[in-house]
Amino acid sequence: MWVILALLAIVAAACGGDDEGGGETGGETGAATGAGEGITVGVSWNNYNEERWAKFDEPSIVAALDAAGAEYISSDAGSSAEQQLTDVENLISQGADVLIILPQDGEAILPAVQSALEQGIPVIAYDRLIEDPGALYITFDNVEVGRLQAEAVFAQVPEGNYVFIKGNAADANADFLRGGQQEVLQEALDSGAIVNVGESYTDNWDPAIAQTNMEQFLTENDNDVQAVVASNDGMAGGVVAALEAQGLAGSVAVSGQDGDLAALNRVALGTQTVSVWK
């Protein structure tokens, strides 16, 4: 929730919402002062079908903006970087005063971001980095998420063969998460207590691609895998499906993040080790 509150504060500041009454409100947020009155906030989601965005983040953003008196408009790129370019231009055409963008590809989105900035429209990159210094950036501590994932898996499997299922190569978070995981596991890797027997990026964080990659790693290693550090719950689902096909589900530690309902069910069943909620 602190990320949503910080996001609202940035929106209010970007639109000059703190120009009046700042000395009287103390610690109150824009929601309490009506700082968003008359502001239209356009949100470009990379993929609204992701449970985390649809069930938690969007409702929180909508509620905060509504309380501040701001209008919310949105678009869903369906995991298409090309579609997101069009979406952002459409949000501008609809009168967005501020843009919040969860980018599918932090570099591919640059033409639309630069167009917005040239028109004086503030741009906030949400969760994922946009490679433009003019775009504000608010995110979670993804390195710490990676650490927590690795700690949970390593606590269960301190020795053995590890596979790393990373996120989309075009998303900086994939490397932030992997960096945190590496911090925790470096000593064990150096000592040979654990061995990295497979590592891959996953286009669009797609569970089906994660499953295919995991199937390949199982084949390459004759199913001799004891742990999988998967960077989110969707991909963890693909990993578990690959493990189930080989009769290994429940015997291999698997990480994730986002607190998806399906992932929590897998944790309860013992086929997934951890889901980090950020």
Residue ranges, per PLM feature:
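Bacterial N-terminal signal peptides that target proteins for export
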Residues: M1-V3
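C-terminal motif of bacterial Sec signal peptides marking the signal peptidase cleavage site
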Residues: I10-A14
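A residue-level marker of the well-folded mature domains of exported/periplasmic proteins
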Residues: C15-K278
